[in-house]
A protein has these predicted regions:
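N-terminal leader/targeting pre-sequences
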Residues: 1-124
């Protein structure tokens, strides 16, 4: 199952080969989804406790991690050991609306929600 997850979340196209060694750089020097890179790996450790605040990981907006997966790799040969999906609790309604006003006289409005309802309005003056 964990083999079905994709690569690290990397919306800023960070070149992993230019990232510092694990745990030695700032969070912006790693892929957003490379938590081991940012905070150090779990190799040769039987217990880890800590608290981390990562400004590049959000639960809302265009770069949200909701709907993505978290994967823990196991050593000595790194392989995907444990994974989970990050999903909102309960049912969440998502709506999007886009309004475009073009001078001298074109108005476009589009609305969509997760129930597949759509409203479109075009007015050309």
């Amino acid at each position: 199952m964990c083999g079905d997850t994709g690569k690290h979340f990397n919306p800023f196209n960070v070149d992993k080969s230019s990232s510092p060694p694990n745990g030695q750089g700032s969070s912006d020097q790693y892929e957003v989804g490379d938590l081991s890179g940012k905070y150090g790996d779990l190799a040769m450790k039987t217990e880890v406790a800590g608290s981390f605040v990562d400004p590049s990981i959000t639960l809302f907006g265009r770069l949200s991690i909701v709907g993505r997966a978290v994967v823990i790799h196991k050593s000595p040969v790194p392989h995907r050991w444990v994974c989970a999906n990050i999903e909102p609790e309960g049912v969440r309604e998502v709506k999007t609306a886009v309004a475009t006003f073009t001078y001298p006289g074109s108005n476009i409005f589009d609305f969509h929600d997760n129930n597949k309802n759509s409203i479109s309005y075009n007015n050309h003056i």
